[in-house]
Amino acid sequence: MPDIIWVFPPQAEAEEDCHSDTVRADDDEENESPAETDLQAQLQMFRAQWMFELAPGVSSSNLENRPCRAARGSLQKTSADTKGKQEQAKEEKARELFLKAVEEEQNGALYEAIKFYRRAMQLVPDIEFKITYTRSPDGDGVGNSYIEDNDDDSKMADLLSYFQQQLTFQESVLKLCQPELESSQIHISVLPMEVLMYIFRWVVSSDLDLRSLEQLSLVCRGFYICARDPEIWRLACLKVWGRSCIKLVPYTSWREMFLERPRVRFDGVYISKTTYIRQGEQSLDGFYRAWHQVEYYRYIRFFPDGHVMMLTTPEEPQSIVPRLRTRNTRTDAILLGHYRLSQDTDNQTKVFAVITKKKEEKPLDYKYRYFRRVPVQEADQSFHVGLQLCSSGHQRFNKLIWIHHSCHITYKSTGETAVSAFEIDKMYTPLFFARVRSYTAFSERPL
């Protein structure tokens, strides 16, 4: 076996080699590329994470679940935003369908309205309570504007003064309106103010058709000013309440008094329907019992001059209402009389009327005049009616509730009066007002 000889360098040479390696490493670090710097940064991050895992109280499961939880949280947030947008879109669609159903119902298309109602409630069951809408004053603008504008309300309060300021003066004569198009005919603006106001009194007429006056005020600014003339509204109030409305307090204007103070309405008729069941005649068959359903109507029509008409009949309103336009009706069973309004201390307005059957002059019967031995005792029969005036729903002063009904018979020979009071039970159903356009179709006399 050959001998192995180990040769070791001297100690000084070894130290010199180590020093040269260190200097070479420092030079290499100074000359590192960006890729190597990134690698070193990743290595440092790995070492820090490794040291954190070795720390007590930290498990590998927590470290594995941390990125999963972050990803799950971001997904849940995204899904929640998407769900919220879907709910909002669904509610908007349900609101649109519900408003469409309201419009169809107002137009009389009930089947179409039910279809839209069903679709809206399938999307959002409580959509009816999530819609904030208000009616216009005349109740015809359904489906158009559902949110009130307070700024417009404040402007409407000063509309009269605003229109008065906008009027122009030409040749020292007040021009209420201007022709829109040039014409060779005489325009209504040429008429004097007094003549125009007289025409407006014909529009109101003796029937107190203030509804037509309000519609006339929508033509132009000048007509609006004429329709707000205090004298017209004062005459209307005097015709309704007489001497009891001399003072304007607590109202600010005659127009406000006419609109707010309780009164009966003249442009229609109050109608009630009563239904009951009674037993019929007995038949030979013991297993059959006849029952009859009885229906009849009551009609009450008031006039501005204090007259009133009342009719009880089984005929339906379609055939009776046209006959009640004037007091000169040919219906035999009609009762005519007078009424008055009474406002008690309890702030309840009541209507009291005394009505009698229409008197008819019968020709004398000469056939059996010599055979009559006992003279017929002549008597006058009248009915006293008491009603309480109320408001129901969106309409004002459209309901009459029975509070009194009695029959008074006065014998002419003795002057005695027999009174029979009727019990107010469920057979006396309330009367509700129904406006009739034909009652104010034309005017007979001015206000």
Curated annotation (Swiss-Prot):
User: InterPro entries per the record?
Assistant: F-box-like_dom_sf, F-box_dom, Hrt3/FBXO9_C, MIT_dom_sf
Q: Where is the composition biased (Acidic residues)?
A: 26-35
Asked whether the keyword Magnesium is assigned, the reply is no
Disulfide-bonded cysteine pairs: these are: none
Q: Which residues carry this modification: Phosphoserine?
A: 136
- TPR repeat ranges per the UniProt record: 94-127
Alphabetically ordered keywords of this record: Cytoplasm, Phosphoprotein, TPR repeat, Ubl conjugation pathway
Q: Name one GO cellular component term.
A: SCF ubiquitin ligase complex
Q: Does the keyword Zinc apply?
A: no
Question: Recorded GO terms, molecular function?
Answer: ubiquitin-like ligase-substrate adaptor activity; ubiquitin-protein transferase activity
Describe its assembly.
Part of the SCF (SKP1-CUL1-F-box) E3 ubiquitin-protein ligase complex SCF(FBXO9) composed of CUL1, SKP1, RBX1 and FBXO9. Interacts with TTI1 and TELO2; when TTI1 and TELO2 are phosphorylated by CK2.
Another remark in the UniProt entry says: Overexpressed in multiple myeloma leading to constitutive activation of the PI(3)K/mTORC2/Akt pathway to promote survival.
| Name listed for the protein in its UniProt record | F-box only protein 9
Question: What is the gene called?
Answer: FBXO9
